[in-house]
Amino acid sequence: MNQHPGIIGKKIGMTQIFNETGEVLRCTVVQAGCVVIGKRTLEKDGYSALILGLGERAEKHTTKPVAGAYKKSGQTPKRIVRELRCSPEHAAKYEIGTTLKVDEIFEVGQRVDAQGRSRGRGFSGVIRRWSFAGAVNSHGTHEYFRHGGSIGTNMTPGRTLPGLKMPGHYGDETVSALNLKIAKLLPEDNLILIEGPVPGPKNQVVTIRGAVKKRGGKGIVPVQQPTKKKGG
């Protein structure tokens, strides 16, 4: 489980910046600004985590038990609430009501994982949803150009197996983009510029955390270069 420090933010859109060598970098802009609204501790809950809130929610749209919990902690109801696990040392740095700053959590050049909800594309066929090639367009093919082919089996087991790639709802799923690089931080506006795309449309809530599967790190097997034999 990812226990690296992280934040929740809102995807603003994409832009371009130049690096030190003049190369154009296509970046996704994420607006941070989440507030610590609660904590989990080892002594009470058995694990350590920060409960973060983003955006405001009208109290009339909040149930009374939840509104009472917010009032007890001195906070206003939040539209988005996420619980991010972290080390006890990291959780101890922040008090309830503190707004997380991007320059306190991340640094330029750091690798991060971004998680969000992908753009929904509705009911789609197998060519769009699964990149099937489709049937041939000649030699007697009739009204079968974009079909997925056979979905059945033999007499045993005699049924369509679960998990088969078929037409259905495409998108609107939780997607994680791994090992993205932070190109720039704007602490005065609490913005993060991340190289490459981040899942979801504009105004989508995303979770940004330190990368788990760092490139060249543990779990990554380096490519072995062939060595020439002596005298060969």
Curated annotation (Swiss-Prot):
Keywords: Ribonucleoprotein, Ribosomal protein, RNA-binding, rRNA-binding. The keyword Cytoplasm does not apply. It comes from the Bacteria. Signal peptide: none annotated. One of its GO terms (molecular function) is rRNA binding. PROSITE patterns: RIBOSOMAL_L3. InterPro entries: Ribosomal_uL3, Ribosomal_uL3_bac/org-type, Ribosomal_uL3_CS, Transl_B-barrel_sf. GO terms for cellular component: cytosolic large ribosomal subunit. Belongs to the universal ribosomal protein uL3 family. One of the primary rRNA binding proteins, it binds directly near the 3'-end of the 23S rRNA, where it nucleates assembly of the 50S subunit. Part of the 50S ribosomal subunit. Forms a cluster with proteins L14 and L19. This is Large ribosomal subunit protein uL3. It comes from Sorangium cellulosum (strain So ce56).
